[in-house]
Amino acid sequence: MKSLRQVLRDYLVRRAFVGGYSWDVDKYSLILEVITYSLIPVPVITYLITKSLPLSLMLAPTPALPILLVVIWSTYSVDSVKEGVEWELPFFVVLLDIVHDVGGDITHAFELSGKVGLRWIGREWSIIRRYSLTTNSITKAMQVRARLHPSLEFQRFVNGYVSVWSYSGDVGGYVRSVEGTYLSTLSSRLSSLSRQIIDVVVATVSSLVVLILFVIVTTVLGMNYAILYIVPAVALLLPALIARVYQSIPYIIRMDVIRDKSVYMALGASVMVAAILILYLGVKGVMALMLPPLLFSAMVTRRVNAMRDSIMALPDLMRDISEIVKAGVGIGAAIERILDNPYPPPLIAYLRGINQLSGNAEVNGPWIMRFAMGVLRELSSLGSPSRALDRLVEVFLELKTIMMGINYGSRSLQLLNYSLPAVFAGITYISRFVVQTISSIIENAPYALIGLSIPGINAVLMPLLLTAYIVSLSVALLSSLLGNLSINPTIKYVIPIPLTLALMLITVEIPVLA
């Protein structure tokens, strides 16, 4: 019978082979065994100390927690390999088609994958080369890796390619036949993912607004108004949703821009100013909470818009270069000729960088931009195949269509973002109306209503303002994630935040119609 250490070791070995990892399984299994056995007496010791049987029973699964955490960690590691390879596989197929056009094969495409930003595919190539040291054959090593790989798409592609390579030899036709399928599948996955995210976000925010109304009604009808502070805590679920949405958006289409230290310094200073104003001014100082998002968005708006324009201009760039190359000009000379065209400044800067003599200028920007510049840089050494450039035009047109489709699909979320000021202003007005109406009834009643406490509007307003701020900021970030595919919101996405706070404070000052 196997010991716990042997069982854990065998499990980690299998997961390491599937994921292509080099884990120290002996060390991990030994540590897990020691921790698990040391936790077995915990329920018994707890019962001897507390004499509480329910508490001891609750702690009974404690010894299994380390094993559960390792299972979750190993599963997440393997799933990361699967998702990363499946997102990059369509672009690798495009790169392979380009390499075939100049007489290369899949090994050359694997070699180039790391240079053009396909890091997960490049990782697979390093694993295949390691396997080839024992199989003495690249094709056998590819089949071994495909057999162990967690992605069925990668398995089918590699096995199909090796089969065609071994028999008919028409690998170019095979690649062209699956290229369109992979690109259309990529488009469908991204579109369905964006729709699911939008539906979940809208449902969550709508449910939160209903919860706020329910808590307000129960509060003004006599419950302790401290329960209102539960609502901001519930609203903090939205930042967790933002983190999950950010992870759900594939890095291949995210527009992450580089932020310098001045942005973080300004953000920190604005947070300190807002905190000081709230301490001194109380409820009215909450208006200062608009400073951090407004200042941050003002500093990144130009950069985000320029980067988005650069990505949207990639199909036109590839088309212009393709037309010049077809006239018999090399890619380097073609890039020099189009530098005077009215392209966005970041795109011009990237083109100047890759056209230097060294050709090794680092591209700091979104993954799409790194892939485009990397392919252009490598094409100059592949002989400037015009057909490859035409294929790149189609690829970037497809990506542009996908990104525009996600943007249009998020319009409902953007409408929700701009409707939040009116929603929260209406909630504030209704709260004042109900509070003042019931207070007037109690004051004019001929008898005492014992046990009925009506909170003041200021007691209701502070948690409402905090909730409105959290919800509005979260929806602004979510709108930016699905509109610009960036966690950096531009001005148009954060405008509802100060509008929400201002309208709520104005609503408190205007008279209530009795």
Model-predicted segments: where are they?
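Membrane-interfacial amphipathic helices
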Residues: 1-50, 69-82, 183-186, 200, ...
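Bilayer-spanning, highly hydrophobic alpha-helical transmembrane segments
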Residues: 32-47, 55, 59-68, 186-245, ...
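Membrane-interface junctions at transmembrane-helix termini in multi-pass inner-membrane proteins
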Residues: 250-255, 479-486
